[in-house]
Amino acid sequence: LSYTYRHSDRLFNGQSGVANPNNISTTFHRISLNGQFRFSDELTLSAFVPWLEGGRKERGTTDRRLSGLGDVTLLAQWSPWAGDAEAQPLLSGLSLLGGIELPTGEDNDQPFTGNAAPSLFQLGNGTFNPKLGFSYGKAIDKSSYFGRVVATIPIGESDADLDSGSYLQASVGTGYRLTDALTLQLSVDGTFRERDQLNNVDVSNTGSVSLSVTPAVSWRVNDKLAVDASASIPFFHDVRSTQVAPGTSFQLGARFNF
């Protein structure tokens, strides 16, 4: 179970911040119920069910709201060498990822294309979105190292003729176990988005590159419960046209083992 908060109020054009005289901003709250089942050392299946609350403001007045179920994601992780770590010490940390994002979130009949992040302000994009990628993790004594790359490739168009752009998410980081219960992590994360299309025409204020640094802490309360906290702090934006760039996001989570 996790909760994420993000407030965004900085306008960018390309890599430069620009004036925001109308005080355009967006605020998002997301509660996500996540489940994971391990069939074996090699195969794990995960599900992510998000609930979203959001609003867009201009000149101090909320002109757009979101509330409801977002797009549910199913993801399989296959680690072919996980059960043979002694014979394959380097490959044992490699996992292949594959899954799909389901169109469970409501998509708008007339998607909003104003200066907002995301540019098309809706709970879901109305298409099936396959996901492919890989991850790698390695622990050495009290230190750990990890990386992850996942591409999302929407198929087809929504009922409103919205063709969402593909995007790539990448992360690389390290962790250090201070005690048996307390671990600190630091990662650099990137999101690379192609432009969306509406009625077969590029939406000008879509498509971007965002980089952020994410410090995180994990506390294992006992064998059944762990608590996590993190903050994702953007340090680089490169957007097409003028957009509200994503602001800092804060996340709190709890993990239960059954």
Q: Model-found features: residue ranges?
A:
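Transmembrane beta-strands of outer-membrane beta-barrel proteins
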Residues: 1, 45-47, 74, 92-98, ...
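Residue-level signature of outer-membrane beta-barrel architecture
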Residues: 3, 37, 49, 78-80, ...
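Surface-exposed strand-loop-strand hairpins of Gram-negative outer-membrane beta-barrel proteins
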Residues: 5-30, 113
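Sequence/structural signature of outer-membrane beta-barrel proteins
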Residues: 6-12, 54-58, 83, 101-107, ...
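Outer membrane beta-barrel transmembrane domains
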Residues: 10-21, 161-258
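Long, hydrophobic/aromatic-enriched structural stretches that serve as scaffold segments
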Residues: 23-75, 79
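Residues that define the transmembrane beta-barrel architecture of outer-membrane proteins
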Residues: 27-31, 66-72, 92, 126-130, ...
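Short loop/turn motifs that connect adjacent beta-strands in outer-membrane beta-barrel proteins
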Residues: 42, 81-93, 142, 181, ...
